[in-house]
Amino acid sequence: MTSSSVLVINSGSSSIKYQLVDPETGDAIAKGLVERIGDPMGFIKHVYGDAVTEEELPVPDHTVGMREVLRLFDTEGPSLAEAGILAVGHRVVQGGRYFDGPALITDEVRNLIEELCPLAPLHNPAHLKGIDVARELMPDVPHVAVFDTAFFQQLPARSALYALETETAEKYSVRRYGAHGTSHQFVSQEIAKLEGRDDLKQIVLHLGNGASVSAVKNGKPIDTSMGLTPLEGLMMGTRTGDIDPAVVFHLQRVAGMSVDEVDTLFNKKSGMKGMTGESDMRSVWDMIHNDDDPEAQQRARTAMDVYINRLLKYVGSYTAELGGLDVITFTAGIGENDAAVRRELAEALAPFGVKIDVEANQVRSGEPRVVSTPDSAVTIYVFPTNEELAIARQALTFA
């Protein structure tokens, strides 16, 4: 049992995910989740060592959910008193222009997070529920907000600003905020350590159901694909990614769709799911290789071509912005586990001297690894992200 730890909380609209982290080793001492908050019957899972506890019980609100989390630590272990919690780190999606790093949660900081809810209406209100309850139930430890957008507050104006009327943009805080910043910062810093140099020109591909790209030069971000919201950029599991904004007006005029209907279409019914009916990449690959319906097979292959092509566009443009490229890193669920996506992108980059080691690329491992050949012009890494550890380390600065 460690004598010092950080409790990391990610509070969603109907869930609480948590992890007790040893910030020195990076080990998850215990972890779990509370799901279906507000439904007639909720679900709780707590993992400590080899012991897995699962329960179904009513969880009417986040207060009850957080109390159940603390109960499970008491009954199933580890005791939070023995774990020596030094801080509680809260994931917060949107920090706006206010936060370029982690922040000790005071009443003032809490109110600023609330003020930013219009920029992240699905996320910040849910984070606040978890923050308010956790501060009430654990008042004797520092609570720290770690923002997904903080890393990208360093973006140069040429990348952060849209070509929108300045007065309107400033009045309504319209600019590129990015997302997945905690992951992009963590991965790019760890790659710099592995390479033994800080003057790297890096592209980080955070590829999960939500996906984003960042260009990092000398440890600083110079561009990223997500924008005002996480909708912009790459094709994703259910999101369009980049799309002509006039499509919104077109659908309103010819289909009679409301703003909310277009929002739902773009965010929840598009991307891979919209083009193939499946949001999971494993299912899409299965359609490509095994589907008996030639039309479905072709739709899936076309969707994958669009996905790879969007990646290729961003890698190409970011390489130009960086003035060259030393490292490409794949991370998150698809980036870490989908060898075919990595191979197809690398093959598309072959004219620029990028060479993937086919055997190394096929190896499944939870460890950081190089999957390019020794003579590749760019080193390709697969690096497991660890946002919980990153949040824990940032929270620890206030302990």
What label would you give each PLM region?
Residues 6, 15-59:
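Short glycine-rich, Thr/Ser-proximal phosphate-binding strand/loop in the N-terminal lobe
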Residues 73-123, 144, 150-161:
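Short beta-strand-loop/turn "lid" adjacent to the catalytic site in phosphate-handling enzymes
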